Amino acid sequence: MSKLQDRHGGEAAADVGRRARHQRLLLSFPVFPIVLLLLAPCTIFFFTSGDVPLPRIRIEYARRDAPTITAVAADTSPPPPSPPSSSPPPLSFPPPPPPPSSPPPPALPVVDDHSDTQRSLRRLRQLTDSPYTLGPAVTGYDARRAEWLRDHTEFPASVGRGRPRVLMVTGSAPRRCKDPEGDHLLLRALKNKVDYCRVHGFDIFYSNTVLDAEMSGFWTKLPLLRALMLAHPETELLWWVDSDVVFTDMLFEPPWGRYRRHNLVIHGWDGAVYGAKTWLGLNAGSFIIRNCQWSLDLLDAWAPMGPPGPVRDMYGKIFAETLTNRPPYEADDQSALVFLLVTQRHRWGAKVFLENSYNLHGFWADIVDRYEEMRRQWRHPGLGDDRWPLITHFVGCKPCGGDDASYDGERCRRGMDRAFNFADDQILELYGFAHESLDTMAVRRVRNDTGRPLDADNQELGRLLHPTFKARKKKTSRAARPM
C-alpha cells in the first residue's frame, strides 16, 4: 500500500514538475513582442484610415459667449478624393466642419471704437429721447472760480498787465489720415501753433480724442472746451482753432483790452448774422471764449443740436428754414451758433463780439498767392489784417484726406506748404535763416550773427525773441544805489 502511494505520489510530483517547466518555457518565449508586432500595423491603419469615424475636438474662437471647447461628432460622409501623392499621408488632419444641424454662431465684426461701423452699431439718440447734455448743470461757477483764484494766488488768471492767461485748444481725429501726407501736414500745423504760443506765452492743449461719441466731427470741441474750463480755473480765455488753421502773422496778438466786457470773440459781421441771417455770417473755426458761467451756459445750449442721427437731421432742416442759403443737410456747429444768436439774441448777443478788424479767420484761397507781395509791401508782420493776415484758414480742404473736400487736394497741399513756410520764415529769421522760396523746404542763411550775435538792430525781431511780458520788472533798492 505504501509502495502504491509512493508511486502515485511520485507521478503527481512529476506532473507538477512538468507543468512548471512548460510554464517557464511559455514565459521565456517572446509572446508580447510578437503580439505587438502583429497589432501595430493594424492599429496604425485603424487610426489613419479616413473611413473610420472618430469623435473630434474642435476649439472655437468665434464669440466670447461661445463654449471654449466643443465636442463634435465626426462627419460620416466619405471625404472628397485627394490627388495622388508620392509622399506619405500626414498623421493628423484639420478638424472636420461642424454638422449642418448646429452651425457655429457668426463672429461679431472687430472694428475700431471710433469707426463708422462701430458708430452705426450704437443706438442713435431719437427725437423722443431726452435732450443731450454735456454733463450735470454747473451753477454758481463765477463765485466758485473767484474763490479758487483767491486761494491759489500762485496761479493768477492774468500773466501781466492787460494780458489774460490764454489756453489755445486744438486737435485732430484719433485715427491716422487716409491721405499718406495728411499726418505730416497735421504735424506741421501743430508746430505752427506751438511756435505762435511760445512767442506769445500761451499755453496749448492738443487733443486727438473724441470725449463723447455723440459729439463727433465738428462738435468735438464742445465737451473738450467744457472739460478744460472746469479743470483749469486759472485760465481766463480759451482760444479754439481748427486743425486746418495756420498762423501767418507770428507777431500780432489780439487786443485783449477790447474784449473786457465780452465772453465770446469770433470772426463775423453783425449785419450778416443779425440782419441777413446767413449761416456764413461768422466762422466757428477760430474763436476766443471766456472761462465763466455765461460760457458754460452757452455750451449747454449749443450741444443738444449735435448728436448724430435724427437730432442732427432735424436741426439741419430747421437751420435751412431759418438761415439764409443754408442747405438742409445735417446740423453743424457753426450754423447752430448762428441759429442761437439769431433766435436768442436777447440772451447771448450782448456778450458776443463779432470781430472783423483783423483776420481771426482768413480764407486761404484769397491769401496764399499774395505772401510775396505782402513781404515786399509791408516788410514785417504785426498787422493781422488783410495786409498781413493773422490766420490763414484752409476751409474746405481736408488735410487728412476724405471724399468731402471742396477743393482739389494738390491745390490745398501747395497752399498749406506756402502758408507753413511763410509763417516758419518769421521764426527762422530770428536765428538768421529763411526758406529759399515759399515753394521749397530748403533753407538758406540770411544773416551772419557769428560776429555780433547780441546785436538788436531789428526791433521787430527783438520783440519776438524777447517780448516785454516775459521780462521781469526792474527793482531798485537803496542798497543797490551808488553812493
From Swiss-Prot:
EC class: transferase
Cytoplasmic compartment residues: 1-26
Superkingdom of origin organism: Eukaryota
Localization per Swiss-Prot or TrEMBL: Golgi apparatus membrane
Keyword terms of this UniProt record: Glycoprotein, Glycosyltransferase, Golgi apparatus, Membrane, Signal-anchor, Transferase, Transmembrane, Transmembrane helix
Lumenal topological domain: 48-483
EC number(s) on file: 2.4.-.-
Segments passing through the bilayer: 27-47
Entry keyword annotation includes Transferase: yes
Entries under InterPro entries matching the protein: Glyco_trans_34, Nucleotide-diphossugar_trans
The UniProt record lists the keyword Transmembrane: yes
Biological processes annotated in GO: xyloglucan biosynthetic process
Biased composition (Pro residues): 77-108
Cellular component, GO annotation: endosome; Golgi membrane; trans-Golgi network
Annotated glycan sites: N448
MF annotations from Gene Ontology: hexosyltransferase activity; UDP-xylosyltransferase activity; xyloglucan 6-xylosyltransferase activity
Membrane topology: Single-pass type II membrane protein
Region annotation Disordered: where it falls in the sequence: 71-119
A Pfam entry, by short name: Glyco_transf_34
UniProt record similarity statement: Belongs to the glycosyltransferase 34 family.
PANTHER family per record: GLYCOSYLTRANSFERASE 4-RELATED, XYLOGLUCAN 6-XYLOSYLTRANSFERASE 5-RELATED-RELATED
Function according to Swiss-Prot or TrEMBL: Probable glycosyltransferase that may be involved in the biosynthesis of xyloglucan.
Name by which UniProt lists this protein: Probable glycosyltransferase 4
Organism (species): Oryza sativa subsp. indica (Rice)
